[in-house]
A protein has these predicted regions:
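Conserved short alpha-helical segments that host acidic/polar catalytic motifs at enzyme active sites
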Residues: 1-263
Length: 263
């Protein structure tokens, strides 16, 4: 049992306080899932790319005496690899010791960047986009929003999720939303249970797709990425998902200028 929410302002102009609105909606859904909360929000595109990534899980901070040194080493390796690929970091923010936001300039293949960075042990890219910012962590919406400073996020639309873990671990990796890697600005949230997860996951992995968790919801994001990589537009891919996915489900998907629902 989880909660999902979405909002879009088609005539937002310079944007509205999407962060505050999403937090209000997700906090109202706290009873549907107290384990973790996630946001996929869309701000103004200034021509740069936003990379949201983590170098550890929140629980890791309590699990190892060496974790702070490990986190430092991982972050230094990420920075080195970005430099090696010619990625110019113009702004860095670290809302937590393990979660980071980089604003970058890069005109090359962002999939190559994502793969090279995620090759670092313990590192996961949560999202890449010109307007998408994906934030998720343990706790309810008020906790996550305050931790990441989301209450004044200005944008046009967003989707979010409150999670009650039933099929996978309680950690950031298993929290929603999921980025539709490697497509910039595409994210998914889901409520329900997919009964053909493992069969379809193995098929997609054989096709070269990667999964970062054991959460069945990630299958939706990977499937949409697969279909769009083969030329489908978002609406066509979503219609195909109705037959492809087995189980009881409802999901929301957002792009830089669209918000859709399938069930």
């Amino acid at each position: 049992m989880c909660g999902i929410a979405g909002i879009i302002h088609k005539k937002a102009g310079k944007g509205v306080n999407i962060g505050e609105q999403m937090t209000s909606m997700l906090q109202a859904l706290k009873h549907r899932g107290p384990d973790s909360t996630g946001y996929a929000m869309y701000g103004k595109d200034n021509g740069n790319q936003i990379i949201r990534f983590k170098v550890a899980e929140a629980a890791d901070l309590e699990g190892s005496y060496d974790i702070h040194a490990i986190i430092k080493d991982r972050l230094e390796t990420v920075n080195s690899r970005l430099t090696e690929l010619g990625v110019k970091v113009v702004k860095k923010e670290s809302p937590t010791e393990y979660a980071h936001r980089y604003e970058v300039k890069f005109s090359g293949d962002m999939k190559k960047v994502a793969d090279f960075v995620e090759d670092v042990e313990g590192v996961e890219i949560l999202s890449i986009g010109n307007s998408l910012e994906l934030v998720k962590d343990l706790g309810d919406a008020s906790v996550v929003s305050n931790q990441y400073g989301l209450n004044d996020f200005n944008g046009t639309h967003g989707i979010g999720h409150t999670r009650m873990a039933t099929e996978s671990d309680v950690d950031i990796r298993s929290a929603h939303p999921y980025w539709a890697y490697p497509f910039s600005d595409v994210a998914v949230v889901h409520n329900g249970q997919l009964t053909n997860y493992w069969t379809n996951r193995r098929a997609l992995e054989r096709s070269g797709h990667r999964f970062s968790s054991n959460c069945d919801s990630e299958l939706i994001a990977v499937y949409l990425a697969d279909r769009m990589s083969q030329g489908d537009d978002l609406e066509t891919a979503m219609k195909g998902s109705i037959d492809y996915l087995d189980g009881v489900f409802t999901y929301l998907v957002a792009t830089k200028d669209q918000l859709g629902m399938a069930k």
